[in-house]
């Protein structure tokens, strides 16, 4: 990855580059940590900001399993702990989550996430403000001939939620972010002051950026 960036530096004018941005899944953990360390060592003094975005998606084991993720809740907790010593003043950590709309109805008739502890952990994680920013998306499912029967169940809301459930969960998670001090600077993006993604704002405004 470092060699790719160094090659880009040869062919593009990156003297005034404002942000290097990388996107990773949270596994394999040690490999991700090592990549972050190498990138920081090579580029931290050269560029003012290095942004790492991690596709967490959910803290709910059932949702993670249904969506084919390789990490479950305890593994994600360990991953987040391992990121703590890698946080620096020039490093921005973003975390991606998806509103799956997987809910149930309690005995009192309240609608809530199927795993209430997952919601509590999400709220505690957000309130800690360890994350500089969050990306929050809604689940989108499309027909696929290879897994047609499974996809029909997915789209029907049998596995995850209906569209209404998904939007309801998005609103719930969005409010948690806003209440914790994160500002909404794009439809799906929230950040602490001065931590919004430069590349998110730049490519939407058709300004110069290099995508690899």
Enumerate the predicted regions with their spans.
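A C-terminal junction/extension of Radical SAM enzymes
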Residues: 147-212
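Conserved non-cysteine loop/helix-boundary elements of the Radical SAM core domain that shape
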Residues: 1-175
